[in-house]
């Protein structure tokens, strides 16, 4: 048909930490495993990721858990991909959230921009090691890691690439 895809799915990872019926493990252990599983399936390393679409539900426990996982994967290795979340613009789509975020990230890859995190006035000091961007940048990502976490410690990660 001659249609160019918006993005290519390189890999995915899933892991559950079962810490609590409602929340993920406070240290982000399940999300770390899901990210590592996605890297393995995609055949890439953390150094190849230039943008992370965080799950970022704006909850103290959830954001802290995800922040620790991202710190383990990236900051501890002196890597600083751009990180933002589209939820502040779209709201939480509940069971649609990960699909909606995949569409938005695919559009960002195709159109050549990196979405910023809306409505951040003061970044929590515990996230200062992370490269959280607040405004949209007109530089498109090449390799994107997109996180989704759910009740009971369910974690799914997709890795998308510019085709």
Regions found by a protein language model. Give the residues of each.
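Condensing-enzyme catalytic core mediating Claisen C-C bond formation in acyl metabolism
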Residues: 1-42, 50-51
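A glycine- and small-aliphatic-rich helix-loop capping segment at beta-alpha/alpha-beta transitions
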Residues: 26-30, 65-77, 161-163
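Conserved beta-strand-centric core segments of catalytic alpha/beta enzyme folds
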Residues: 1, 97-163
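Conserved catalytic cysteine-centered active-site region
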Residues: 67-99
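Conserved small-residue
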Residues: 9, 49, 54-55, 66, ...
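Stable alpha-helical structural segments in soluble proteins, enriched in small hydrophobic residues
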Residues: 34-42, 69, 73, 105
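Glycine-rich phosphate/pyrophosphate-binding beta-alpha loops
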Residues: 57-59, 88-95, 148-155
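Beta-strand segments within the central parallel beta-sheet cores of soluble alpha/beta enzyme folds
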Residues: 4-12, 47-54, 81-88, 116-123
């Amino acid at each position: 048909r001659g249609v160019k895809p918006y993005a290519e799915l390189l890999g995915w990872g899933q892991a559950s930490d079962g810490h609590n019926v409602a929340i993920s493990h406070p240290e982000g252990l399940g999300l770390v495993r899901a990210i590592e599983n996605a890297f393995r399936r995609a055949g890439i390393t953390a150094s190849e990721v230039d943008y992370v679409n965080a799950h970022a539900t704006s909850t103290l426990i959830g954001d802290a858990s995800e922040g620790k996982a991202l710190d383990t994967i990236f900051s501890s290795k002196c890597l600083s991909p751009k990180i933002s979340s589209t939820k502040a613009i779209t709201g939480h789509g509940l069971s649609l959230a990960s699909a909606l975020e995949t569409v938005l990230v695919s559009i960002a890859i195709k159109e050549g921009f990196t979405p910023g995190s809306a409505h951040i006035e003061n970044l929590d000091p515990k996230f200062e090691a992370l490269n959280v961007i607040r405004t949209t940048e007109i530089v498109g990502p090449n390799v994107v890691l997109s996180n989704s976490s759910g009740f009971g410690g369910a974690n799914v990660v997709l890795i998308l690439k510019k085709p």
